[in-house]
Amino acid sequence: IKPACMPWGEKGGDGHGVNATNTIRAKAILRSITGNIDKIGGDQLTMPGDRGGTEDMNFNHNDLSQEQRDKMIGNERFPGLTFKGWDIISKAYPRFYPYSNAPLLFKAMITGEPYPVKACIVQADNPMLAFTNTKLVYEALKSLDLLVVHDYFMTPTAALADYALPAATWLERCSRGYPTMDVEQVSMAGSMPVVERFEGGTDVDFRDDYEFWYGLADRLGFGDKYWGPTMEDMMDGQVEPFGMKFRDFCEKVKYLKVPNKPEKYKEPGFKFLTPTGKVELYSTVIEELAKETGQDFDPLPNFVFPPDFPEVNPEYAAEYPLCM
């Protein structure tokens, strides 16, 4: 059927369980072999277009020594998420961000293995409700020497924190959004805070996410990695190619449409963000990770029985004869 779009699933339902990665990979492969990539009515490939700016002024992971990168919890067991995967994927996709596996991180907080984790900063999350095994999460957070939460509300996690810091809401910060992103256009909109915060030299007790991290980075000597001390400084960098400041963009332009052509892969020199530059039905990234770690990673999607299925644990069969 053409054109056809295969959505990711309501609330990321296909991203749970032991088959999550293979399910998502299989869907991506089906998009490819049915010819429904980047077509009107199919699955889009939205691109940066001409909006440009200094958007890629991100912290360079190469600033971390290899010794520090090797310490990332989960490097061996879940290399696709961590710096092991980043070393491979970032060559084609520089904006890939590595991170640790959360359950392993919680266990490290409690046990001190592979090394002690003594502090945690929580932002845009509530681990006490967001993760399974709440008792484990509670024990992990209580094991920390320092827990900082930056949030709108006094969540259960914030209630455990040594410092609960108020975050700026959408009314109190600069915002930039993309109301529509399809194969024909990418739309960009911007807004200034409804509550002006710095007029007359006065300040308030809340901070937006950008200010929070800039303030910490500046005190640690990394302030030059940022656009400036405020989110408006960052937004100015986003609209720099248009020859205006972000405040002017919000007042004069407000809404911008950037053309986005379908079937961009037909253009000379186009490459997909894979090591081969092609749509990979057989993942060269997973193949390389398997070689590096010695783990049995299949470059092609396969099915794995969940741990509570009779095929894996026959003891369940008598009590639960029907598995769905």
Residue map of PLM features:
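Short clusters of hydrophobic/aromatic residues that line enzyme substrate/ligand-binding pockets
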Residues: 44, 176, 194-195, 272, ...
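Long, low-complexity segments enriched in small/aliphatic residues
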Residues: 22, 54-63, 70-72, 86-89, ...
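Non-catalytic alpha/beta scaffold blocks inside enzyme catalytic domains
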Residues: 1-29, 33-39, 48-51, 64-241
